[in-house]
UniProtKB/Swiss-Prot annotation:
It comes from the Archaea. It is a multi-pass membrane protein. It is found in: Cell membrane. The chain crosses the membrane at residues 7-27, 57-77, 140-160, 193-213, 225-245, 260-280, 290-310. This is Putative transport protein AF_1800. It holds the Pfam family AI-2E_transport. InterPro entries: AI-2E-like (IPR002549). GO terms for cellular component: plasma membrane. Keywords: Cell membrane, Membrane, Transmembrane, Transmembrane helix, Transport. Belongs to the autoinducer-2 exporter (AI-2E) (TC 2.A.86) family.
Length: 340
């Protein structure tokens, strides 16, 4: 009879967990981002913890979230304005393309270019109108997830230690120290992973500013901030800044556009994403650079925004488990009298 009720209890817990996951799935991006932001803000909270747990959590959350929110919303507004301008003023792009062709010595095909641009922009205008509701839904969900990430970040900073303490009290007493050390290993790995990733994003944003200024790109400080924001999501996101800027410079001056594209790809993408980030973050979190790079790429392809963060965390969890048990084995060998 006891076994029957134990089975019913386990099944009930599984059903509740499955339903919870199902209802939380649309908000998964916000929850995961909130956890990541909490690990980024954790070193800040540790420095100011003397002011109190709640106050330190609020300040640390604000220090991390405020710059990101300002850059994200201002970037979205500017991007929307520029997209509307391009769609309604496609003649400017058309004349820019014709200017590029004339500089390259290609005089033929003017009517063909005009026909292509007019058709492309008419298709864009007609396709945007029916999908306006869908775009509004996605934008609303994005904003909602971002605000959820702020709330999750704050509560993760404020209450995570209490949660771990209560969870530890459920563990059998003879295993509590082992469980506590295991949780600490995971915590250190995740903190090193996401704080290191945040530092690399800041470096990419700072390094991009001289490039934008050198090539006389408008809104250079804003674009540098957006590069930092894009670099928070590794491997893919920088292209959302590099390609539009390259296209703009190509319309202004072909040589400048090609030079920026080449230099931008090498110094703002290949070097930081394929060399600096994997090695730096791998060094701080003790995760192998190749495994980390594959986790970022695979997670993004499979799970979108949340996948970018969940896959490296799974790899980080596996690394923490490996590091913990290798440390335990080494400690056991050192204390073994027969090994002396």
């Amino acid at each position: 009879m006891n076994k029957y009720w134990t089975l019913v209890l386990l099944l009930s817990i599984l059903v509740v967990l499955a339903l919870t996951f199902y209802f939380f799935t649309p908000l998964l991006d916000g929850i995961v981002m909130g956890v990541v932001f909490a690990y980024v803000a954790k070193p800040v909270k540790r420095k100011i913890e003397h002011v109190g747990r709640i106050k330190a959590s609020v300040i640390a959350t604000a220090i991390v979230i405020l710059p990101i929110s300002v850059l994200m919303f201002y970037g979205l507004i500017q991007g929307l304005n520029q997209a509307i301008y391009l769609i309604t003023h496609y003649k400017v792009i058309e004349s820019g393309i014709l200017n590029i062709l004339s500089k390259m010595g290609i005089e033929e095909g003017e009517e063909y270019v005009k026909w292509i641009t007019s058709n492309v922009f008419s298709i864009l205008q007609s396709s945007i109108q029916p999908s306006a509701v869908e775009i509004t839904k996605k934008a609303t969900l994005l904003i909602l997830n971002f605000f959820i990430s702020i709330v999750v970040c704050f509560y993760a900073l404020a209450d995570m230690e209490n949660f771990v303490r209560r969870t530890t009290s459920v563990v059998p007493e003879d295993r509590r120290d082992e469980f506590r050390r295991f949780v600490e290993e995971i915590d250190v790995t995740f903190e090193s992973l996401w704080f290191g990733n945040f530092v690399v994003a800041i470096l990419i944003g700072l390094v991009s500013l001289p490039f934008f200024l050198y090539f006389n790109v408008p809104f250079a400080p804003l674009l540098s901030g957006l590069m930092f924001l894009a670099a928070l999501i590794p491997i893919f996101a920088e292209w959302m800044i590099i390609l539009p800027v390259s296209l703009y410079l190509l319309l202004v001056d072909v040589g400048r556009g090609l030079s920026f594209l080449l230099i931008g790809v090498v110094f703002l993408y290949v070097l930081p994403e394929l060399i600096l980030r994997p090695y730096f973050v791998g060094y701080t979190s003790k995760i192998h650079p190749l495994v980390l790079m594959l986790a970022f790429i695979g997670g993004g392809l499979v799970g979108g925004i949340s996948g970018f963060f969940i896959a490296p965390m799974i790899v980080g969890l596996a690394t923490a488990i490996y590091n913990y048990y290798t440390k335990e084995e080494l400690a056991t060998e050192n204390h073994d009298p027969e090994s002396v």
